[in-house]
A protein has these predicted regions:
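Hydrophobic core of transmembrane alpha-helices in multi-pass small-molecule transporters
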Residues: 40, 120-136, 241, 319-332
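Extracytoplasmic gate region of multi-pass secondary transporters
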Residues: 50-54, 229-287
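Helix-to-loop junctions at the C-terminal end of transmembrane segments
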Residues: 82-95, 282-294, 376
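C-terminal ends and interior cores of transmembrane alpha-helices
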Residues: 104-117, 304-315
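Intracellular juxtamembrane helix-capping segments at the cytosolic ends
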Residues: 135-149, 332-345
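Helix-loop-helix hairpin linking two adjacent transmembrane segments in secondary transporters
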Residues: 159-210
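A late C-terminal transmembrane helix in Major Facilitator Superfamily
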Residues: 168, 347-380
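C-terminal transmembrane helical hairpin of 12-TM major facilitator-type secondary transporters
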Residues: 275, 279, 292-340
Length: 413
């Protein structure tokens, strides 16, 4: 080294980026099942609730249906705003306290909703539920698992998403039956009690303490990616956002779109019901396929989604098959969201960035019902489907770009 060049002191861990403590042993099958059940409970009491509760609420209160459905968009927007903070709290304190508290926060929102007799209080309830969603849904859980188990978290994520894939299949008929017998307000109270009694004790029992990340004392600046390649970061973020938009549009508008294509309401509902089992089936097949780089799962996800949408759009006689193909692809989305970033960046960065990467997805989900409603009103079912096909094609192109990065370097930091 030339004499006139000063020797640089070694950088500390916080200057280089976040670092992790020792990882824990992977959870056993029973723990994975319990974590999946907990996700079903929290998803069912938040994101999936409005699908069966919005109409009874609107009929009972007289509030405009667009405001009732808009409450879910509000909760998603709140969750989007808080998602980066959620990941940072997981990194600083470990995920167990936050995951355990998430059920209680959603429960408080449900209790406020049950007591709401004004639209303003109802919207406040969903803002509180949005806080609980940021604390306890997939992104927070994936960050928690990454902090606890490092690269080994992939196995747990796959198993948990397999079980949690039954969230809508189980929660919709259960909540609908409860509303029929007890009314929507009593159903909210009962669901809140279940969350308060079950979620915190089980999370505290199943998740080990720890998983904290040594983070910089200064909050990372906006747009900072903590040493992760910026182009890769935005490629992954864009992929997940587009996937979330497509999923939300289908979840909200599929029945109406199918009716617009000429199917009766019972047939449309029957076709839509095929999505849940096909999503779970694809996750089972992914497990049976064995260990491989998740970029191949990502390619299967976006390809099947595109093929399924094209079949529904252009081959009316193959609508049922197209929805099965779409469901198989969409079922892989949650697995890819958890596994692909973990394979492309060190676990410590993964813990901190999961929440930030989810923000565009959540904002897109919040805006999708409004934009989708506009497209459906002005351009009909074909307008909605063609837009979704273009988005799905874009995702295929994005995955091919990421695949080139994987072949060049299995991990890009």
């Amino acid at each position: 080294m030339p004499a006139n060049r000063p020797v640089q002191p070694p950088r500390t861990a916080t200057e280089i980026g976040p670092t992790l403590h020792t990882y824990h042993r992977l959870p056993g099958p029973l723990s994975i099942v319990l974590l999946g059940v907990l996700q079903i409970l929290v998803w069912g009491g938040s994101f999936f609730l409005m699908a069966v509760m919005a109409d009874p609420i609107s009929r009972d209160t007289g509030w405009p249906s667009q405001w009732v459905y808009g409450a879910l968009s509000l909760s998603l927007m709140v969750s989007a705003l808080l998602a980066p903070l959620s990941s940072r709290l997981v990194a600083r304190y470990g995920g167990r306290p936050q995951m355990a508290a998430s059920g209680a926060v959603v429960a408080v929102g449900l209790l406020i909703m049950a007591a709401s007799h004004t639209l303003g209080l109802f919207l406040l309830a969903w803002a509180v539920i949005g806080i609980g969603m940021a604390m306890g849904l997939y992104e927070a859980l994936f960050a928690t698992l990454g902090g606890l188990y490092g690269e080994g978290a992939g196995k747990a994520i796959t198993g948990i998403t397999l079980i949690a894939g039954f969230a809508s299949t189980l929660s919709w008929p259960t909540v609908a039956l409860a509303i029929e017998h007890f009314g929507w307000r009593a159903t909210c109270v009962c669901y809140a009690l279940v969350l308060m009694v079950v979620v915190a004790p089980l999370y505290w029992r199943v998740l080990p303490a720890g998983g904290r990340v040594e983070v910089p004392a200064k909050t990372p600046a906006k747009g900072e990616t903590l040493g992760v390649d910026r182009q890769l970061y935005w490629l992954l973020t864009s992929m997940f956002a587009i996937g979330a938009i497509i999923m939300t549009a289908i979840a909200v508008q599929l029945v109406a779109v199918l009716q617009g294509l000429g199917h009766s309401l019972p047939v449309a509902i029957g076709l839509a019901a095929m999505l849940g089992p096909s999503q779970v089936a694809s996750r089972v097949l992914q497990i049976l396929a064995g260990k491989r780089h998740p970029i191949w799962t990502a390619l299967a996800w976006v390809s099947l989604v595109l093929i399924g949408l094209l079949m529904v759009t252009f081959i009316p006689a193959a609508t049922a098959v197209g929805l099965l193909v779409f469901g198989c692809g969409n079922g892989l989305r949650a697995i890819v969201r958890g596994l692909l970033p973990l394979a492309m960046m060190p676990p410590a960065q993964y813990v901190l960035l999961m929440g930030r990467m989810s923000r565009p997805s959540l904002i897109g989900q919040a805006l999708t019902p409004v934009v989708g409603g506009f497209l459906f009103e002005h351009f009909g079912s074909m307008g909605v489907l063609l837009t979704l096909c273009l988005l799905a094609l874009t995702n295929v192109l994005l995955v091919t770009v990421v695949m080139r990065r994987v072949r060049a370097a299995p991990r890009v930091v």
